[in-house]
A protein has these predicted regions:
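Hydrophobic, lipid-facing positions within transmembrane beta-strands of outer-membrane proteins
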Residues: 82, 127, 140, 168-174, ...
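Transmembrane beta-barrel strands of outer-membrane/channel proteins
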Residues: 144-150, 188-192, 275-279, 320-326, ...
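Repeated loop/turn-to-beta-strand initiation elements of outer-membrane beta-barrel proteins
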Residues: 184-186, 270-275, 315-318, 378-380, ...
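Acidic, glycine-rich flexible loop segments
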Residues: 34-302, 312-314, 326-330, 339-347, ...
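Residue-level signature of outer-membrane beta-barrel architecture
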Residues: 133, 178-179, 265, 310, ...
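Short, solvent-exposed micro-motifs at the edges of structured domains
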Residues: 168, 468, 567-573, 580-890
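Solvent-exposed loop/turn elements at secondary-structure boundaries
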Residues: 340-343, 471-488, 492-638, 769-771, ...
């Protein structure tokens, strides 16, 4: 623990807790900082001074690098419950934020042609083709800070058994700016975050009478015993939730490091050059509630930029930049992992999942140029950007092997595990190292035209071609062509109606996304260089060898394919807003934002097993009942989904009224898709989330609410600065200068789907794929919010559903027709700065996240065949936390 942290905990914790209790009693609310679009990082006072030096935004880094330990407290976010694990690659952090918090309906005032706005209507930051850094502040300036959080002041999460385990978090750093020589300014920013904690969570483990193998063969018994011994020795202690529920703890450590260096040089009266290098890393020694459950992760990011700016005259500026980005990700199994990935219905899986290990390096070489010129009533801009993308490394697809134990063969899944009788085995063998290359480009031009004092127009055209990826050693050939017709027009206007009626604004634009690397790289897993084999009802001891009775199992390869017509996803985004000028002290906005997204990525699971005359409809005969008897699944990536989003939003900003700042927003929205949203990569978990019950009529079967849909959302932020209070002198001296701020976030819960939980006869359609849903018996339960552990089973009774017959194609229950519990969160902070001498200041800040210790419940058990169906067993957030910051700035 750092010296500053020790001082804080020896002298201030009890008093700070009392202050926050008083704040809660008074009902103070909301931080008046400008709202950050989700997702973003929690910002304390120690971080804000760094931003003008053009440190890459923490929001972007959090999503790009999948950083843990970050919370956007200013937007009402609570600290996430770390026991809801996701692999720290791809865009998994963004998807976690969307499902856990939902999205923020965002009205973009105007579309800058230099930026890409795909997904911006949901609150995501636009992607810029060129970044022009703001100048470094003049003079000698800097700051030193330390933020500390400790389990001493942390409340238990809702389901936690026993006290909070010892944990602490330190976030400390410094930044410094000064003139190094004539017309040259230097800036450095260095920080570290050390998290040493204990993750609490519920896992499903065998009951006392399920801990012994039921198999007698010594070799098979050894494997079954190894699987069973991977579960904690502790017995279930939350049998009120589920007969197998165990609440337990496991240690986790996270190290985050960041360094940012800038040098700005003025070259004469017209030219300036900025050089920047930024390094970010994260190392995660993951928690293991079950032995080997989660991978350990090392992530490193390097960013280098050179930006040359030339002012030709007072009206024309050109900018040229060249940059290099490198992101490396290494995910590896923990040493106690059992080897293969083992999934048992009714128990926590033995991981990590089939994509581990993973070793990936991504390089981007960027160059861009831009010109802006003002000519009379026109403000012209044009630019060009070119990016060379390189991705190298090893990716896996159950190369460690995968066993599935399901409710099958007339008994439950745990009994099948104890008997060593899996329903399915999948394994991949082959060369998994690849190197892919492609070019991205942007060419754009636009104009801001002031038609008259009351009307402004904005219009632009952006061309965003994407070339066909290539594999450097020609080991794989991408079947689709380069996408050359990605034209993206945009238009906007601002019209002042009258003095009191204010301004009417509108904007429309076409915006393109991307075909993700993780999407097209899957072709590496197809024959002939790689074979993914599926065996039904295998022999546990030798799943690819001879089975019972000396018979060789029917093992078939899985094919990964890309649609030859695969194209870049895009969206039409539009908004209309009215900003009346009824009061000079307040800003009010009424608005609508909508989008229609097309060609969203999804994976279709084809060549499934179908009812065949004369062949029993059982798990053992799945491979015999496929249309193409030579292969197992044919997994085809297509532009198979569309997205629909509409939202109405009203916002009120009251800045600086007698020390009071208020920022409040409410939005009413609806998001629908055909199984895949704008974040779907059509890979692994994403592909299964978008998998239909049957291979036919996929879009009809999957149409429903998006995973991040929320009907209502309300964000209220308020801060108050005590100054010149009319109190006795001593009290006024103690109170004046303190700033109290609070953030209140209230949102509808996001939706979830009830599934059958098994593809086996008596549960599913026995087609070799999961995703089956039951039939609905009681339609009155549709749309229910399952938000209370005490009533969840009553609100979602198993009697309201019925398993389908083995020969039925699908169940009639829709996708995402129920909702998990809502978000009710309050964050608060108290801070004050003291000035000493010239420009020297000292700041103390105390913050609480989830001030009222309100749980945000996860969805209940949603697999009808499992004993925990309908039971809420987890929360999406942590309990109340406090943290304290000391900062010295000059």
């Amino acid at each position: 623990m750092s010296p500053i942290s020790i001082i804080l905990f020896n002298r201030g914790l009890a008093r700070a807790a009392f202050v926050f209790a008083a704040i809660a009693t008074l009902g103070l609310s909301a931080d008046a900082q400008q709202q950050q679009t989700q997702p973003a990082q929690e910002k304390s006072s120690s971080e804000k001074a760094v931003e003008p030096e053009n440190k890459q935004s923490e929001a972007d880094k959090r999503v790009e690098m999948n950083l843990l330990g970050k919370t956007n407290a200013a937007a009402g976010e609570n600290r996430r419950n770390e026991n809801i694990q996701f692999n720290l690659v791809n865009n998994n952090a963004l998807k976690d934020l969307n499902v856990r918090l939902g999205t923020t309906a965002t009205i973009v005032r105007e579309f800058d042609p230099a930026n890409g706005y795909f997904g911006a209507e949901f609150g995501n930051a636009p992607k810029s083709s060129i970044s022009v850094p703001p100048p470094i502040k003049s003079g000698f300036h800097g700051q030193l800070y330390d933020t500390h959080q400790n389990s001493v002041t942390t409340a238990r999460s809702f389901f936690q058994v026993g006290g909070v385990k010892p944990a602490h978090e330190n976030d400390y750093g410094f930044n410094l700016g000064f003139v190094v020589w004539r017309n040259a300014k230097f800036f450095i920013d260095v920080s570290q975050q050390k998290i040493r904690g204990s993750v609490n969570g519920n896992v499903l483990v065998p009951t006392p009478d399920e801990r012994a193998p039921l198999v007698t063969d010594p070799a098979t018994l050894a494997i079954v015993a190894r699987f069973l011994n991977a579960y904690p020795k502790e017995l279930p202690n939350r049998t009120d939730i589920d007969p197998r529920a165990l609440n337990t703890n496991a240690p986790q450590s996270i190290d985050n490091n960041q360094a940012n260096i800038r040098l700005d040089q003025v070259l004469g009266s017209k030219d300036s050059v900025a050089l920047q290098y930024q390094f970010t890393s994260q190392s995660v020694d993951a928690f293991q509630l079950v032995a080997g459950q989660n991978p350990d992760t090392d992530t490193k990011s390097h960013l280098a930029r050179i930006v040359w700016t030339r002012s030709w005259d007072a009206k024309t500026i050109t900018t040229f930049s060249i940059g290099y980005d490198r992101l490396t990700s290494l995910l590896r199994p923990e040493e106690n992992a059992v080897g293969p990935f083992v999934s048992t219905s009714g128990l926590t899986s033995l991981g990590p999942d089939g994509t581990i290990p993973l070793n990936r390096a991504q390089n981007q070489i960027r160059t861009a140029t831009q010109i802006r010129s003002t000519q009379g009533a026109h403000d012209w801009s044009a630019g060009f950007g070119l990016t060379r993308r390189q991705v190298n490394g090893d990716e896996t697809d159950v190369h460690r092997g995968f066993f599935s134990f399901a409710n099958d063969f007339g008994v439950d899944a745990v009994t099948n595990l104890r008997m060593g009788r899996p329903s399915q085995y999948i394994a991949s063998i082959g060369d998994i190292h690849r190197g892919f290359r492609l070019w991205d480009a942007q060419l754009y031009a636009g104009d801001k035209f002031q038609v008259n004092p009351r009307l402004n127009l904005v219009y632009s055209l952006r061309w965003q071609p994407a070339t066909k990826p290539t594999e450097v050693n020609n080991l794989n050939v991408i079947p689709y062509d380069s996408d050359w017709n990605n034209l993206a027009p945009s238009f906007g206007f601002a019209y002042r109606i009258s003095k009191k009626l204010g301004v009417l604004r509108g904007a429309y634009g076409v915006h393109y996304g991307e075909i993700f690397f993780v999407t097209y790289q899957q072709i590496r897993f197809s024959p002939p260089l790689n074979t993914k084999t599926v065996v039904t009802a295998p022999n546990l001891l030798d799943p690819l060898g001879t089975g019972a009775g000396g018979q060789i199992p029917l093992a078939l390869p899985t094919i990964y394919a890309l649609d030859p017509k695969l194209a870049t996803p895009y969206s039409h985004q539009y908004n209309l807003s009215w900003e009346p000028d009824w009061n000079k002290s307040a800003r009010l906005q009424f608005g609508y934002v909508g989008s229609r997204s097309h060609k969203l990525l999804s994976m279709w699971y084809l060549n499934r097993a179908h009812p065949t005359p004369g062949v029993p409809q059982t798990t053992e005969t799945i491979n015999q009942r496929r249309s193409d008897p030579e292969i197992a699944d044919y997994r085809l990536v297509v532009n198979g989904s569309r997205g629909y989003f509409d939202a109405a939003r009203v916002s009120l900003v009251l800045p600086g009224w007698k020390g009071l700042n208020i920022d409040a927003s409410y939005w009413f929205s609806k998001a629908i898709d055909l199984g895949s949203s704008y974040t779907n990569t059509a890979n692994e978990i994403d592909s299964r989330k978008g998998r239909s019950q049957n291979e036919f009529e996929t879009q009809r079967d999957m149409k429903g609410l998006s995973d991040f849909d929320q009907t209502h959302a309300f964000l209220w932020r308020m801060s108050y600065l005590f100054r010149q209070t009319k109190l006795p002198r001593l009290m006024s001296t103690l109170i004046d200068g303190w700033n109290i701020s609070t953030v209140v976030l209230v949102k509808t819960g996001t939706p979830f789907t009830v599934g059958s939980g098994s593809d086996a006869p008596g549960f599913g359609n026995v087609d070799g794929n999961g995703g089956d849903r039951p039939n609905l018996v009681d339609p009155t339960i549709l749309g229910r919010t399952i938000a209370d552990p005490d009533t969840s089973r009553q609100l979602l009774p198993s009697s309201s559903f019925q398993f389908i017959n083995p020969t039925d194609a699908r169940g009639d229950l829709g996708r995402n027709v129920f909702r998990k519990g809502p978000i009710h969160n309050v964050n608060a902070s108290l801070h004050r700065s003291w000035g000493f001498k010239k420009d020297l200041r000292f700041t103390f800040r105390a913050e609480s996240i989830n001030l009222f210790n309100t749980p945000q419940f996860a969805e209940p058990g949603f697999d009808l065949s499992n004993p925990n169906f309908g039971a809420i067993t987890n929360t999406l957030n942590e309990g109340r936390t406090f943290r304290f910051t000391l900062q010295i700035g000059w």
